[in-house]
C-alpha cells in the first residue's frame, strides 16, 4: 500500500502544482459528485420525468452508499492529507507539501471514494434510462443514430466521472486508486439494479424491512469489530489532528452521518410512494400531463435548494443524527407526495371549468 500511497502523493502534488488555476472548475466537479446532490437535484428532476427511474435512483444511491460505508470500514483507507503527515517512509521530512482546501477534511476512511461511487452509480442510471428511452423511439433501421447516441451519452458519462475523480484527487481527500475503486463499485451496484425489476413497485413493508436490515447490519458490524478492539471511527481524531483549519471539519462527513441520511431518504420514499397523496396526484388524471410534471419538477427543485438553508445543530451528535434523519425523510415526502398533491389541487379548478 505504501507504493500506491507514495505514487498517489506524487500525482496529487503534480496536479496541485500544475493545475492550480483550474481550482474553480475542479471544485465545481467535486460538488457535482457530492452524494447529497442526488437527493436535492437529480432525484427531484428525474422523478417527475420518469417515476420508475427516480425511484430506482434512490435505491441505487442508498444501497451504493451503504456498501461504500461497509467497504470503508473493511479497507481502512487513509486520506492523503493526513497520511502524508503520519507516514514515516519519507526520510528527513522530505515529503511533498500537499495543499488543503475547505472541502478536503472529510473525516471518514478514504477507500473507496464516496463521491466517485455515488456519482458513477447515479449517472449510470441516468445514462441507461436515457438510452432506453431513445432506443424505444428509434426505427430499427436507425443503426447509425443509435450508435451516435450511445457513444455520446457514454462519453458524457466518462467525462463527468473522470472530472469528479480528478477533482477529489486534486483536493487531497483521495488517492487515485480510491476513486477508481469508487467508480467501479458504483457501476456494479447500478448494473445490479438493472436486473432487479419491480423496485419501483415495492410496498411500504419492503422499505421498512430494508431500512431495518441496513441499520442493524451496519450497527452490528460496528459493534462486532468493537468487541475485537477495532475502532471504526479511528479516522475522525486523525482528521481533526491534521486538518489545516478546524472550521473545515464537518460532522456530516462522519460515517454514521451518511448512513442516517440515506436511511432517512429511503424511509421517506417508502411512505411517500405508498401514500394517498401520491396516488391521487402522480397516479391520477393529471399525472401524465406535461404541464403537471413541469410544475412539479420546478417546484421540487426550488424547494430542495431552500433546504440548504436549514442548518442542523451539531453540538450534540444524537440530536444531529435524529434531525438529519427527519430532514432527509422529508425530501422524498415533499418531492413525491406533498408537492405533486398541491400542484394537483391547484390544477383541479381549471379542469372543472373546461368541462
Curated annotation (Swiss-Prot):
Regions of this protein lying in the Cytoplasmic compartment: 46-56, 137-146, 190-211, 274-290, 340-355
Lumenal side: 1-24, 78-115, 168, 233-252, 308-318
Gene3D superfamilies linked: Phosphatidic acid phosphatase type 2/haloperoxidase (1.20.144.10)
Classification via InterPro entries: Glucose-6-phosphatase (IPR016275), P_Acid_Pase_2/haloperoxi_sf (IPR036938), P_Acid_Pase_2/haloperoxidase (IPR000326)
Motif (Prevents secretion from ER) on chain: 352-355
Keywords: Endoplasmic reticulum, Gluconeogenesis, Glycoprotein, Hydrolase, Membrane, Transmembrane, Transmembrane helix
Catalytic residue list: 115, 174
Entry's family note: Belongs to the glucose-6-phosphatase family.
The protein's name in its UniProt record: Glucose-6-phosphatase 2
Amino acid at each position: 500500500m505504501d507504493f500506491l500511497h507514495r505514487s498517489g502523493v506524487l500525482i496529487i502534488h503534480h496536479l496541485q502544482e500544475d493545475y492550480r488555476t483550474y481550482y474553480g472548475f475542479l471544485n465545481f466537479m467535486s460538488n457535482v459528485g457530492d452524494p447529497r446532490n442526488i437527493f436535492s437535484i437529480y432525484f427531484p428532476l428525474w422523478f417527475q420525468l420518469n417515476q420508475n427511474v427516480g425511484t430506482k435512483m434512490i435505491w441505487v444511491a442508498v444501497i451504493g452508499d451503504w456498501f461504500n460505508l461497509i467497504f470503508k470500514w473493511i479497507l481502512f483507507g487513509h486520506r492523503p492529507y493526513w497520511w502524508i503527515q503520519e507516514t514515516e517512509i519519507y526520510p528527513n521530512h522530505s515529503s511533498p507539501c500537499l495543499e488543503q482546501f475547505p472541502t478536503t477534511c472529510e473525516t471518514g476512511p478514504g477507500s473507496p471514494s464516496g463521491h466517485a461511487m455515488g456519482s458513477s452509480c447515479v449517472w449510470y442510471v441516468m445514462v441507461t434510462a436515457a438510452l432506453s428511452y431513445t432506443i424505444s423511439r428509434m426505427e430499427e433501421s436507425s443503426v447509425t443514430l443509435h450508435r451516435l447516441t450511445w457513444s455520446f451519452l457514454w462519453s458524457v458519462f466518462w467525462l463527468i466521472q473522470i472530472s469528479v475523480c480528478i477533482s477529489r484527487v486534486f483536493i487531497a481527500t483521495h488517492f487515485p486508486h480510491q476513486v477508481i475503486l469508487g467508480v467501479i463499485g458504483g457501476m456494479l451496484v447500478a448494473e445490479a439494479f438493472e436486473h432487479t425489476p419491480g423496485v419501483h413497485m415495492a410496498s411500504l413493508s419492503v422499505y421498512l424491512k430494508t431500512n431495518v436490515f441496513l441499520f442493524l447490519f451496519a450497527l452490528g458490524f460496528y459493534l462486532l469489530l468493537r468487541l475485537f478492539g477495532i475502532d471504526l471511527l479511528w479516522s475522525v481524531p486523525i482528521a481533526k489532528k491534521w486538518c489545516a483549519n478546524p472550521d473545515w471539519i464537518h460532522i456530516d462527513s462522519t460515517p454514521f452521518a451518511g448512513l442516517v441520511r440515506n436511511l432517512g431518504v429511503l424511509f421517506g420514499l417508502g411512505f411517500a410512494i405508498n401514500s394517498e397523496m401520491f396516488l391521487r396526484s402522480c397516479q391520477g388524471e393529471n399525472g401524465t400531463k406535461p404541464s403537471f410534471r413541469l410544475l412539479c419538477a420546478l417546484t421540487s427543485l426550488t424547494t430542495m435548494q431552500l433546504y440548504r438553508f436549514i442548518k442542523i445543530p451539531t453540538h450534540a451528535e444524537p440530536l444531529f443524527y435524529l434531525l438529519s434523519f427527519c430532514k432527509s425523510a422529508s425530501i422524498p415526502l415533499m418531492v413525491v407526495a406533498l408537492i405533486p398533491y398541491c400542484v394537483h389541487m391547484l390544477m383541479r379548478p381549471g379542469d372543472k371549468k373546461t368541462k
